[in-house]
Curated annotation (Swiss-Prot):
Cofactor(s) needed by this chain: Mg(2+)
Function text: Catalyzes the reversible isomerization of alpha-D-glucose 1-phosphate to alpha-D-glucose 6-phosphate. The mechanism proceeds via the intermediate compound alpha-D-glucose 1,6-bisphosphate. This enzyme participates in both the breakdown and synthesis of glucose.
Quaternary data: Monomer.
Gene coding for it: PGM1
Modified residues (Phosphoserine): 124
Protein name: Phosphoglucomutase, cytoplasmic
Cofactor: how and how many bound: Binds 1 Mg(2+) ion per subunit.
E.C. no: 5.4.2.2
A biological process term (GO) from this entry: glucose metabolic process
Compartments it resides in: Cytoplasm
Organism field: Populus tremula (European aspen)
Binding site for alpha-D-glucose 1,6-bisphosphate: 25, 124, 303-304, 367, 386, 388, 399
PANTHER family reported for this sequence: PHOSPHOGLUCOMUTASE, PHOSPHOHEXOMUTASE FAMILY MEMBER
Record-stated family: Belongs to the phosphohexose mutase family.
Amino acid sequence: MVLFNVSRVETTPFGDQKPGTSGLRKKVKVFKQPNYLQNFVQSTFNALTPQNVRGATLVVSGDGRYFSKDAIQIITKMAAGNGLRRVWVGQNGLLSTPAVSAVIRERVGVDGSKATGAFILTASHNPGGPNEDFGIKYNMENGGPAPEGITDKIYENTKTIKEYLTADLPDVDITTIGVTSFSGSEGQFDVEVFDSASDYIKLMKSIFDFESIRKLLSSPKFTFCYDALHGVAGAYAKRIFVEELGAQESSLLNCVPKEDFGGGHPDPNLTYAKELVARMGLGKSNSEVEPPEFGAAADGDADRNMVLGKRFFVTPSDSVAIIAANAVEAIPYFSAGLKGVARSMPTSAALDVVAKSLNLKFFEVPTGWKFFGNLMDAGLCSVCGEESFGTGSDHIREKDGIWAVLAWLSILAYKNRENLGGGKLVTVEDIVHNHWATYGRHYYTRYDYENVDAGAAKELMACLVKLQSSLTEVNEIVSGIQSDVSKVVHADEFEYKDPVDGSISKHQGIRYLFEDGSRLVFRLSGTGSEGATIRLYIEQYEKDPSKTGRDSQDALAPLVAVALGLXKMQEFTGRSAPTVIT
């Protein structure tokens, strides 16, 4: 057994290590600065209770992006230096973010141990590579992201750090499954490399009826396509969709994980998932080949999802509402009923209507999955989602892209249980249109203005807040831009009081609410690594079934004009068009 010694290394603080909603994300060159990663990791260990460090078990893995392998070795040595008992690593350093959550909650090590937390190495949907983004976040013993109380402590520690602890271990082989043991002054330290997918697959099989999905996928009527965008979802896609569920291997796109995501942007939306969008018949040029019935994509760390039907896009806001409306019938895990449902504030109110109709508890929370986690830990929420392509349930404490795809396949299997032999297939588009006929439609779009000058973005938001003090003035501006829209009846900055722990989150987005249920929401996003991103959300509710079939951009055009005029978007940003429209 290799012996190791622990050393204390002097360091000085960096001023830019404040974690955002999903940890710390920066360019790779920033993380490669001497002691940059080490400072953040030590500041995290120092923010945790002693029982979550000394003698504890830590998971360290991620989406496989560039610099992950180096980071795993650095963190493993620091874990030994800080007195942890063992580190668990997914084979090749790969674990999806939802799989990390599942591993913390479900996995038992070869020696009977349980994990108390994890460092997840991901910048989610941001690009990867030597000149692109890297990220790190800490998840707690419930499998969810560190709450603000912990991330605030981490940030305070980064401002005063003077030293970090590390051990002189050799690099560990993370390509081969097995346990490597070392001996230090406080006893044994183990690094266990384990299969990245098996724990997660076992959990999925306990939630869904794999046999009914297998029947659907084996039907000649039903065709399927899944695009991992060269992210970590590829490590799960073949095992689940091909080996477990019998899909054709040719139905998988870009399912080999790559450090730079194949040079692409691993963000599952209509702009970046070009190959899937074209295959599903939604591209600018129509393919002569008949598109598949169902398509889906994942982001870099596989916690986000995009769901498509043949020539049909399902908005994430509709997706979570449709899953909630069908969960009890179609998914065995929910057969006893839903405890409640929740959505992030910018997400459309489609879920609210389902909750009201089904008499379910309903919660509207700020953006950030940790808010859902609190509700789930208290037994108040079963299904939740956000407009940024995140959907999930209380099976783990992260959003889960593959779970969402399996949920949709379960609903399709249930709706088609009688007609796989004969009769017309119930399609994704049919399911969505039937949902609108029952609950009404929330026309919805999101405009993203990426890498905007941070000063200009803050000024724009400040003007919108100031404007809220006079609804009369707001309505004069609105009617001057577009005379045929409803009037604004309420305007505020969204604030959330957590019903579980009483904590208050302020400044969570600027809202303008209209008399007819329409909404405009403006947010500054904290997930980019450079500049600011302004997100503008536009929503209009239509209850009349004869009016739910319009093109959403056409239906929303008057409100879009109001939003851009109210915010003086071009004046502040210099942009005549958004970077991305969803």
